[in-house]
Each structure stands twice: as structure tokens, then as C-alpha cells.
Amino acid sequence: MPKYYIHCGRFFDGVHEDIDENINMIVDGAKIVNVGKSLEKPRDAVFVDLSQYTVTPGFIDAHAHYEFIGPETFNTFSISDSDEMKTLNMVYNARQALLKGFTTVRVTGTAFLGFGCIDAKRAIDKGYFTGARFIVAPHALGVPGGHWDFSIFYCNTNPMFSEYMEQPFAITSGADMFKHLVRKQIKYGADFIKIMAAGGFASPGDDPGNMQLDQDELCAIINTAKTAEKPVVAHAYTSDSIELLIQLGVDEIEHGTLMSEQTARLIENKQIKYVPTLFSLMPPDDDVDVSTLPPKSDAFIRKLAKYDAQLKESREVVLDLVKCGKTLI
């Protein structure tokens, strides 16, 4: 494999806050083997001049749904697109992510009927396409009428469409049924298991404070996944739901933006991994074109208003937890 000697005008290592200047880097194949100011260029290395640029480690998008393109697909999850089109969307989005500096994307549940997301991941891993590498949970596990059941948007206005919208999502009830779903995700190549354990903001039929799976169902999912050595990631917002999930053995919490300081300390002390996703609940910056963002439903807006004070309070708790840097993915 080729060897490169890269001269970086500005260099940020992702560990220290300072940005260094005039740093050299030696890359052998896919591995950075040395970084420093006074490195000599190996004879067999190709010189790459990035003196006009700032060089950073690859970014990680830790919470993404990449099977869509465009802001108008959210409420329907682009249900009219075939699985083949969604697979192509994922490959396209992986390349766009890489061009923007993201080398790894964690896909936390998709709207595929099948497992095209795994095909996209493998095609990129094999070098058929250039793009960010994927870490994938193909289908998030949820309950009827819960956070992952977006068919409820249409159940009273278009029942046939609503019934069809249930098909891409891993929605069921009962411990044995959830065991089956976990085993199926693993069979087709899941890197981790995602649970929609509680309600959310975007879903129309629930509340972020609702716990949606009972303990038997949660234990069935967690124990089945751990038997196969797959980590379990849970969508949850409130302290009660997060503390129960930690007690039952989940490996990571997504969101958590309604939790108390006590719960944040529990996450830190138990070394639970945590992805806050603060951006999705914050107002856009002034220079952002809001027409490019997915529209928020009336239900979403009502919930934001209901939890406005708690979101602001918990945001400071979350930021303090993120600053500690010990458990953040």
C-alpha cells in the first residue's frame, strides 16, 4: 500500500484544545504511523502539501438515518422509495459525509423492508464505493403506537397507507417476539441492537416521558443481544427511563435530554456510553436555511413547548457530562 508524507498547515489532533501549525504526518497504507514537526520524509513516501489547510481526525456522526435524501421524507420515511433506492441513497450519503470530513457514521435504525443498509455497509467496506464507514443497527425495535411506529400519522386518514407504513419497522409486543427480532437483526449482520425504549418528540402518539417496553421485553432484548456479544443502545429521555435501562444492562443511551444531574452522574460513574443529539431539539442558527431542514410536526412542536423549561435545565446537565469526555461516543 502507498505511503504518504503529509505537511499540514494547521493541525488539530482531537485530544488537545490547541491547534498546532506546520505539522508533518506519515501515513503508511491506512494507518497514521507518526506525527510531528521535525519528521523527515521517507524516500518511498508521496509528498502531500496541505499547507493551506487545517487537518483534523475524521469526524464521527454517532446518530444518523442515512436512507433518505431531502427534507420532505421524514413523516413518510420515504415509504414510496424501494429498498434498492434507499440502498443507493445510503451509498450517496456516505460519500457526501466523507467529503464533509465524516469518516464513520453510526446508523441507528432504518426504514428498510429488508437489510439493504447492511449491503451498503459491506459494499463500502469492500471498496466498491468510496464513503464513510457504517456501523449499523438495521431496524430499531419498538412497540405498536410507540416512538418507532410512524404509521400513526395516517391511521385515521389513510388506513391502508398506515398499515403499509408498519412494514419497514421492527414493531412487536412480548418478550419472545422481541427475542426473535434481535436474533434476526444479528443474523443479517447488525453491529449493535437499538431499542426505542421510551417515547419521543418526533412521534405523534406518545410522550418522551412514556416507558414503552415492559421489563420482560427489555430483559429479553438485552440478554439475547449480550449472548451474541452485541451492544444494546436505547432511545430514552427521562431520568426514570434511563436509570431503569442502566439497571437492566444497556450499554449506551441516546438523547437523555430530560435527565437530572443525578442521572448524568450515574451515566458517568457506570461508564455508560452516551450520545446527546442536542442539535435536533435546538433552534437553528441564524445562518441556516430552514427550508433545508425536516419540518417539525404539530405534535413535535407541542412537546417542545411542554418540556421547554426542563429541556433548558437538562441541556446544561448534558453539556457538563459531555465536557467530562469519559463516556461520550
Regions found by a protein language model. Name each.
Residues N75-L88, N158-H180, P231-V233:
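Active-site mouth loops of central-metabolism enzymes
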Residues Y53-K126, P144-G145, D216, L248:
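Metal-associated gating/positioning segment near the N- to mid-region
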Residues V91-G116, T130-A140, A190-S203, P231, ...:
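Divalent metal-dependent hydrolysis catalytic cores, especially in the metallo-beta-lactamase
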Residues M1-K41, V55:
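N-terminal metal-binding scaffold of metallo-dependent hydrolase/deaminase domains
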Residues F59, R122, G127-Y154, V275, ...:
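Glycine-rich, aromatic-flanked loop segments that form ligand/cofactor-binding clefts
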